[in-house]
């Protein structure tokens, strides 16, 4: 779960930007899209293949 603590002198906009960045890094939106619709075995294979390729680059 992503959590952001707003500092005493920090604006809401900057806290919201930090929250969006953390959600993006955690991959929450991608997982939400994946869980929202049925995924065929071929789609699952392609997704995992793509993940492996991405992890090799890093």
From Swiss-Prot:
<feature type="compositionally biased region" description="Basic residues">
    <location>
        <begin position="45"/>
        <end position="58"/>
    </location>
</feature>
<dbReference type="GO" id="GO:0003735">
    <property type="term" value="F:structural constituent of ribosome"/>
</dbReference>
<dbReference type="GO" id="GO:0006412">
    <property type="term" value="P:translation"/>
</dbReference>
<protein>
    <recommendedName>
        <fullName>Small ribosomal subunit protein bS21</fullName>
    </recommendedName>
</protein>
<dbReference type="GO" id="GO:0005840">
    <property type="term" value="C:ribosome"/>
</dbReference>
<keyword id="KW-0689">Ribosomal protein</keyword>
<dbReference type="InterPro" id="IPR001911">
    <property type="entry name" value="Ribosomal_bS21"/>
</dbReference>
<comment type="similarity">
    <text>Belongs to the bacterial ribosomal protein bS21 family.</text>
</comment>
<dbReference type="GO" id="GO:1990904">
    <property type="term" value="C:ribonucleoprotein complex"/>
</dbReference>
<feature type="region of interest" description="Disordered">
    <location>
        <begin position="36"/>
        <end position="58"/>
    </location>
</feature>
<keyword id="KW-0687">Ribonucleoprotein</keyword>
<dbReference type="InterPro" id="IPR018278">
    <property type="entry name" value="Ribosomal_bS21_CS"/>
</dbReference>
<dbReference type="Pfam" id="PF01165">
    <property type="entry name" value="Ribosomal_S21"/>
</dbReference>
<dbReference type="InterPro" id="IPR038380">
    <property type="entry name" value="Ribosomal_bS21_sf"/>
</dbReference>
């Amino acid at each position: 779960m992503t959590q952001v603590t707003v500092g005493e002198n920090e604006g809401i906009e900057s806290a919201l930007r930090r929250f969006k960045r953390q959600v993006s890094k955690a991959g929450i939106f991608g997982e939400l899209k994946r869980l929202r619709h049925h995924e065929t075995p071929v789609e699952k294979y392609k997704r995992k293949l793509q993940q492996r390729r991405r992890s090799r680059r890093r």
